[in-house]
Amino acid sequence: MINEKRLLDTFIGYAMIDSETKNEKAMGEKLVEDLKALGLEVKTDKAGEGFGSNGFNVCAYLPGTIPGEPTIMCAHMDTVTPGNGIKPLIDDGIIHTDGSTILSGDDKSGIAAIMEAVKVIKEQNLP
């Protein structure tokens, strides 16, 4: 079962990591740390170097337990501007900012959802 509080906490934590386009390194490092903590095999590359970014791709592998086609989950780490110093606020169940920055829901909400899915798969020993 999806843990909504944990999912929200994960999103809020990721939203506060500065990762405007070409400056995604901190977000990538956090994802590597979190994925390794979940026991996944993690690999990175130097894709960002080709276009002036300090970022990199993060690929993680969780072996399945039954035969079949793999499932791929994908999201991007960079945000548009103004995306530095994000301070998410929650009012009446709605997540927003003070208006001086974006929220970074695109695509840190996707990253948080992927991380929650992986946690649930592992916790419930799903195939």
What are these regions (language model features)?
Residues 20-67:
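A non-catalytic alpha/beta surface segment that caps or lines the substrate-entry region
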Residues 1, 45-47, 73-74:
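Intrinsically disordered, low-complexity segments enriched in polar/charged residues with Gly/Pro
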Residues 54, 61, 67-127:
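Active-site metal-coordination/substrate-binding segment of hydrolases
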Residues 12-16, 20, 36-41, 119-127:
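Generic secondary-structure signature for well-ordered alpha-helical cores
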Residues 4-9, 35-36, 88-94:
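Short amphipathic alpha-helical segments, especially helix-boundary/capping motifs
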Residues 11, 27, 72-74:
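Bulky hydrophobic/aromatic packing residues
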Residues 8, 12, 29-32, 111-119:
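Predominant activation on well-ordered alpha-helical scaffold segments within soluble catalytic domains
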Residues 1-25:
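N-terminal capping segment at the start of a domain
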